[in-house]
Amino acid sequence: MNTQPHHSSPDSPQDGGWFPISIRLSGARVLLVGGGEIAVNKGRLLLDHGARIDVLAEKLHPAVQGWVENGRVRHVGERADEAVLRRLLPGCRLVYAATDSRDTNRQVAALADELNIPVCAVDDPGPSSFITPAQVRRGMVRVAVSTGGAAPVLARRLREQIETLLPEGTGRLATYMQSRRAFVSGRYPNVQDRKRIWEDFLDGPGAEAARSGDESRADARLEVLLDGERKSGEVWLVGAGPGDPDLLTLKALHLMQNADSVLYDNLVSPALLDMVRRDAELVFVGKQRDRHALPQDEINREMVRRAQGGERVLRLKGGDPFIFGRGGEEIEALVEAGVAFRLVPGISAANGCAAYSGIPLTHRDCAQACLFVTGHAKADGVLDLPWDDMADRRQTVVIYMGISTLPQLAAGLLGKGLPADWPVAIVERGTQPRQRVFTGTLSTIAQQAAEAQVKSPALVIVGQVVRHRVVSP
C-alpha cells in the first residue's frame, strides 16, 4: 500500500483596492436612476434583498413598469437634473446610476458622493464608491466575486464555476445551523468548544443530512458531538467517471474535497486526483484486472479500519462503482461491519467512451438493446459468458476488460454465427486526451489491437452501431 501527502501551494495575495462587505438593505431606500435593461438587472437584485426602490427615469422597461404597477417600486420622477437629485438623495442607503448615459451617471455619482451616500455608476468604477459583485446565492448564504470592476465578464464566469461547486442544500445547512446555535451555546458556553463541535459537524454526515433536509438525522449526529463521543467515520463509494475530469458529477467533486483519505486504483487519472482535498491522504490500492496492490478483502478491511477510526474515506473508482467495479462486494463488507456509507454513481465507461468516440450504443435501425459483459477470464482461462445472448444481431455488446482476451471473444462470437465482417470498435483511454479509436470486424480486430499495441483501459464495442460512428469535423 502506497500513501502520499497531498500538498498545496499558497496563492499569492492580490489587492484589488475594494473592500468586500455585506450591507443590510431590508426596508432601506435605494435610488435607482435609470429605467432600462441595466436598471432591471440591478432592480431584481435589490428587490431580492428587500430594498425599497425609488426609480428616477423618463422611460420604464416593461419589467420596471410592472414593479411600479404592483407597488414594489416607486416611480419618483423622470429627469435626473441636479435639483431633483438633491431632493431625492437625502435618506437613501445606496444609489445606483444605471442610465445609458455615462455623463448622467457621473453627474449622479458626483452629487451622491458630495452627500456621503454610497453610489455605484454601473460599469464605471472610476466615480463609484462601491460596486456590486457577481453573486451566488444558496438561501441565506451569499458568495460574492469581484474583480474591482476590471473584468466583469471574468467575475461572472467565476460565479458560474462557483455555482457548480456549491451544493444546492447549502442554504438549508445554514438555516439548520442558525436554528441550533442557541441550543449548542446553552450546552457549551465556551466559544472554542462550540467552534470545535460545529467544525466536526460540518466534517461529518450530519452536515449532509441537513443539506438534504433530514433534520432528525442531523440532530442525531449533532447530539453525538454534544455528548462528547468520538467522531464516527464514513465511507463514500464514488464513481469518478471514465477519465475526463469535466465528466465528474458535482456530488462526487463535493465529497472529493471533503475526504480525509482516498483509496484509488489505476483507472483514476492524475487529473482527477488533483481535484481531491489537498491535505487528504492518497492511498493507492492498484486494482487492475488480475494485478492488485491489495487483494479485495484487504481493501475492504482498510476501508472499515479507517472509517471506524473516524475518517471520512473516499473509495474512488473509475466509471461507475456498480458496473464491473466490485462496488457491491465493498458495500456488503461495510454493511457487515456496521460502517455508514454513501453511494455516488459516475458516468460509466460505456457511456463516456461511446460518446467521445461518436458511436451510439443504441440505434433505431439496428440496435434495440445494449448488453454489458466483462471479458475477464476465470483462473483457468475460460470465458464464462452468455454467448447465445451476445450473438443477438439486434443489439450492441459492450465488453469491459476485454483486450487480453480479444482473440477468444472474437472466436466465440464467430462460433455463435456472427459473420466475419461484423463491426467491432476499440476505444482506448476513452474520454482522455490520448484517446485512440480503432474500428474493424470480428475477423480483423484482434490483429489490429496487437499491431497497435492497445493497452487497458480499453472498451470493446460490438455491433452494427459501429458503422454509424460520427466524428465532428
Curated annotation (Swiss-Prot):
Tell me the route in metabolism or biology where this protein functions: Cofactor biosynthesis; adenosylcobalamin biosynthesis; precorrin-2 from uroporphyrinogen III: step 1/1; Cofactor biosynthesis; adenosylcobalamin biosynthesis; sirohydrochlorin from precorrin-2: step 1/1; Porphyrin-containing compound metabolism; siroheme biosynthesis; precorrin-2 from uroporphyrinogen III: step 1/1; Porphyrin-containing compound metabolism; siroheme biosynthesis; siroheme from sirohydrochlorin: step 1/1
Chain residue ranges for the region called Uroporphyrinogen-III C-methyltransferase = 233-473
Listed binding positions for S-adenosyl-L-methionine are 242, 318-320, 323, 348-349, 401, 430
Matching entries from InterPro entries are given as: 4pyrrol_Mease, 4pyrrol_Methylase_sf, 4pyrrole_Mease_sub1, 4pyrrole_Mease_sub2, CobA/CysG_C, NAD(P)-bd_dom_sf, Siro_Cobalamin_biosynth, Sirohaem_synt_dimer_dom_sf
Against PROSITE patterns, the record matches this protein to: SUMT_1 (PS00839), SUMT_2 (PS00840)
The EC designation for this entry is 2.1.1.107, 1.3.1.76, 4.99.1.4
What is catalyzed by this enzyme? uroporphyrinogen III + 2 S-adenosyl-L-methionine = precorrin-2 + 2 S-adenosyl-L-homocysteine + H(+); precorrin-2 + NAD(+) = sirohydrochlorin + NADH + 2 H(+); siroheme + 2 H(+) = sirohydrochlorin + Fe(2+)
Name the domain of life: Bacteria
Its BP terms in the Gene Ontology are: cobalamin biosynthetic process; methylation; siroheme biosynthetic process
Residues involved in NAD(+) binding: 37-38, 58-59
Which residues are the active-site ones? 265 (proton acceptor), 287 (proton donor)
What are the boundaries of the region Precorrin-2 dehydrogenase /sirohydrochlorin ferrochelatase?
1-222
Swiss-Prot/TrEMBL keywords: Cobalamin biosynthesis, Lyase, Methyltransferase, Multifunctional enzyme, NAD, Oxidoreductase, Porphyrin biosynthesis, S-adenosyl-L-methionine, Transferase
Q: Name one GO molecular function term.
A: uroporphyrin-III C-methyltransferase activity
Family, per entry:
In the N-terminal section; belongs to the precorrin-2 dehydrogenase / sirohydrochlorin ferrochelatase family.
Q: Entry's PANTHER family?
A: S-ADENOSYL-L-METHIONINE-DEPENDENT UROPORPHYRINOGEN III METHYLTRANSFERASE, CHLOROPLASTIC (PTHR45790:SF3), SIROHEME SYNTHASE-RELATED (PTHR45790)
Briefly state the protein's biological role: Then it catalyzes the NAD-dependent ring dehydrogenation of precorrin-2 to yield sirohydrochlorin. Finally, it catalyzes the ferrochelation of sirohydrochlorin to yield siroheme.
Q: What is this protein called?
A: Siroheme synthase
Q: What is the organism of origin for this protein? A: Gluconobacter oxydans (strain 621H) (Gluconobacter suboxydans)
Gene that specifies this protein? cysG
